[in-house]
Amino acid sequence: MARIAGINIPDQKHTVIALTAIFGIGKTRSQAICAAAGIAENVKISELSEEQIETLRDEVAKYTVEGDLRREVTLSIKRLMDIGCYRGLRHRRGLPVRGQRTKTNARTRKGPRKPIKK
C-alpha cells in the first residue's frame, strides 16, 4: 500500500478514486492532482512507479488535507462559538446552523426526542 499524507491508499483502486480516501480530497481535486502530476486517472495505484507516487505526494502536499484541515475546521467553529455570533450559538446548542426549520425535523442535529414530563 502506498502512503500519502499519512494515509494508506488502497492499491487496487484507480488513482482518482484512491486519492479520495484522503480527507479533504474529493473527486474533482483528485482529478486536478492527477493532471498536475501527469498521471492517467484510470491507472491503479499498484501499477504506479515509486517516482510517480512521489510526485503524487508532492502534489497532495500543496493542499490542506487530513489533520491540518480537521484542525482548521474545528478552530473556525470554536472561533464562532467564542465570539458569540448567531452561528456560534447554534453550534453551542447543537441546533442546525444554516437556517433549517426546527419545529419539525432536525432530529439528527437535536438528537432523540425527549418525552414531555407531566
Curated annotation (Swiss-Prot):
Gene3D superfamilies: 1.10.8.50, 30s ribosomal protein s13, domain 2 (4.10.910.10). InterPro entries: Rbsml_uS13_C, Ribosomal_uS13, Ribosomal_uS13-like_H2TH, Ribosomal_uS13_bac-type, Ribosomal_uS13_CS. GO terms for molecular function: rRNA binding; structural constituent of ribosome; tRNA binding. One of its GO terms (biological process) is translation. It holds the Pfam family Ribosomal_S13. The gene is rpsM. Part of the 30S ribosomal subunit. Forms a loose heterodimer with protein S19. Forms two bridges to the 50S subunit in the 70S ribosome. Located at the top of the head of the 30S subunit, it contacts several helices of the 16S rRNA. In the 70S ribosome it contacts the 23S rRNA (bridge B1a) and protein L5 of the 50S subunit (bridge B1b), connecting the 2 subunits; these bridges are implicated in subunit movement. Contacts the tRNAs in the A and P-sites. One of its GO terms (cellular component) is small ribosomal subunit. The keyword Nuclease does not apply. Residues 94-118 are annotated as: Disordered. The keyword RNA-binding applies. Keywords: Ribonucleoprotein, Ribosomal protein, RNA-binding, rRNA-binding, tRNA-binding. Belongs to the universal ribosomal protein uS13 family. This is Small ribosomal subunit protein uS13.
